[in-house]
């Protein structure tokens, strides 16, 4: 899993396989990052993340900057790949739609402390005031905003 050296030909073959897996057309290989749309950039990032067949994949705000439709497409792609590869995914996100779409377990961290954790299906059942405030997007509650 990603700890051996490969030659240039093998690297190109892997890049081609991963490009196809994330649904990008061959022409994309000739473009600079600045020439790609936000959704294409996210797909390229995902292809790079899976190129070495990792056991764990970290996602940091995977849908930031995307419209809701493209965010849904990226969420579905992440979920498919995680299941297909049988890997562990750790995702940092403020996007609860994304968290619900790709997560099985979730933890809410506030001021560096795990405030709540559990199954994604238990989110709405929680009585934790921090979680309730966050889910509702309320300014009232234990989470105080600082300027």
Where are these regions (language model features)?
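Conserved ABC ATPase "signature" region
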Residues: 9-27
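Conserved ABC ATPase signature
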Residues: 32-36, 40
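Conserved catalytic motifs of ABC-family nucleotide-binding domains
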Residues: 53
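Catalytic Walker B motif of ABC-type/P-loop ATPase nucleotide-binding domains
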Residues: 57-60
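Helical segment within the ABC ATPase nucleotide-binding domain
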Residues: 72-85
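A short, surface-exposed alpha-helical micro-motif characterized by mixed small hydrophobic
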Residues: 99-101
């Amino acid at each position: 899993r990603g700890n051996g050296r490969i030659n240039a030909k093998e690297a190109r073959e892997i890049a081609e396989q991963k490009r196809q897996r994330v649904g990008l057309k061959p022409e994309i290989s000739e473009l600079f990052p600045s020439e790609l749309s936000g959704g294409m950039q996210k797909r390229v990032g995902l292809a790079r993340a899976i190129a070495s067949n990792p056991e764990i994949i970290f996602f940091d705000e995977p849908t930031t900057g995307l419209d809701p439709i493209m965010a849904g497409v990226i969420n579905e792609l992440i979920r498919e790949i995680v299941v297909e590869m049988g890997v562990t995914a750790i995702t940092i996100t403020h996007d609860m739609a994304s968290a619900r779409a790709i997560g099985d377990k979730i933890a809410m961290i506030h001021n560096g402390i795990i405030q709540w954790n559990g199954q994604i299906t238990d989110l709405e059942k929680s009585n934790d005031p921090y979680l309730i405030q966050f889910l509702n997007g309320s300014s009232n509650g234990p989470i105080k905003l600082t300027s």
